[in-house]
Structure formats: structure tokens, C-alpha cells
Amino acid sequence: NWSRNDYDQLAGALAAGHIIECGAQATGGNYSFFKEVPTFKDIGYPIAEINQDGSFIITKHPNTGGLVSVGTVTAQLLYEIGSPAYVNPDVISHFDTLKIEQEAEDRVFVSGCRGSSPPKDHKVCINLAGGFRNGTELLLTGLDIEEKAKLITETIFDSVGGKEQFDKVDIQLHRTDKENPESNEQAQAFLRIDVMSQNPDLVGRLFSAKIIELALANFPGWTGRSGVVPSGPY
């Protein structure tokens, strides 16, 4: 039965919540030292056993994959925090006061968290729709890749009415091809074209359909990795 002024206990609970909020990321998932994880099959989700004083155990269900270690818990603790003073509407949890210990296999004990009163102001996130986008990825093969990329790009935008009608155009040529390829896969470069607009029709199915129409009407040896697709919001 904590009061709103039991800041140390609240800070410990906040730390526990932060550790388990991303699920398996605290039990070995997305962990830089992934070779330490015995298995990723049936990875267990984290469990927080919180004590009256605000200390807690992080563990997982037995006979599940993954790993609960000082490393996995610390990695998640540092995830998306910005400052060691982790701000919450109820308390500020000072993560630099925490003590993290391996209690047993897949059991980590976290204690010592100090808390302070919450701030008067809070951060608010507002997400705005940017518009609509469509894109395609083309595989270019053979010689003269740079010239081929320039040719197909110019042809695509000429057929849809020009680049200037879009709010933004992003063109990227990735030279994954090798100079002396030993297979078809080694001979391929990737050309990525993305277009964005407030008008969904401008970047809709017509845009991708125009690219498909060029399959037999441009240079030889290229193909697309996507068909005719509608636009999507961003």
C-alpha cells in the first residue's frame, strides 16, 4: 500500500515496468551479445516480481527460450531513456542509483532505485499524417548499370507526368552487383524509387502500373520486385 509520496518504491516499480514493457527484449531478444542466449526457440516473456520496498526480480517462465541476465536487463533498462532521470507522471526514477545482480539462473535482482517528485510538465507526442507514398524496387543486371538506372528513372517519370508533381522523390541506386559475377544474383543492382504526395491518386496504382508497362519497353535485363500496388499513408 504505497502512497503517492513513496517515491523510492514508485521509482522501483517504474524501473520494473520499463524493463518488461518491450517483452522479449528483456529476455534476450534484440540483444547485442546474442551468442550468450542459449536458444531463441519459444523465447519466454519477462516477469517482474515486485517487493514491498520497490526492489524486484526479473525472470521468465521455466522451460522457455531466451536469457535473463544482468546484460539483458541492463540493455533494456537503457533502452529509449535519454537521461538516467527517467521521467514519469507519478515519479522520476533515477536509474543511475539501481543495483543489478544475478540472483540465480534466469533471475536478476534489481534494487536501490531512488525516486523524486514528478515534474510539473510532461512530454507529449503528437503524430501527424504526412501524406501518401508509393515505391518500387527494380533489379538491374549486366553492364552499364549507372546508365541503365538513369534511363529507366527518366522514362518512369516521363510516363507519369514528371517529378515536379510529387511533394518528394527519393531515388537510391544500391550497387550490390559484382564486377565479375559468378551467378545471376551477383549481377544484380537495386534501384529504389519512392514518391510522396498529399494526393493519394498521384502515387496510387497508376504510378506502379506505369512501371510494369515498361517491362518490355526499356533496356534489357531488368525486373521489378513488386507488382501494381496502391499508395499508403506515412
Spell out what each predicted region is.
Residues 2-10:
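Conserved phosphate- and dinucleotide-binding cores of soluble alpha/beta proteins
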Residues 3, 39, 88, 144, ...:
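Serine/threonine-rich low-complexity intrinsically disordered regions
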Residues 5, 63, 110, 124, ...:
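Residue-level detector of functional hotspots within protein domains
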Residues 10-117, 133, 137:
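A conserved active-site cap/scaffold subdomain adjacent to cofactor or substrate pockets
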Residues 120-234:
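C-terminal non-catalytic interaction/assembly regions of soluble proteins
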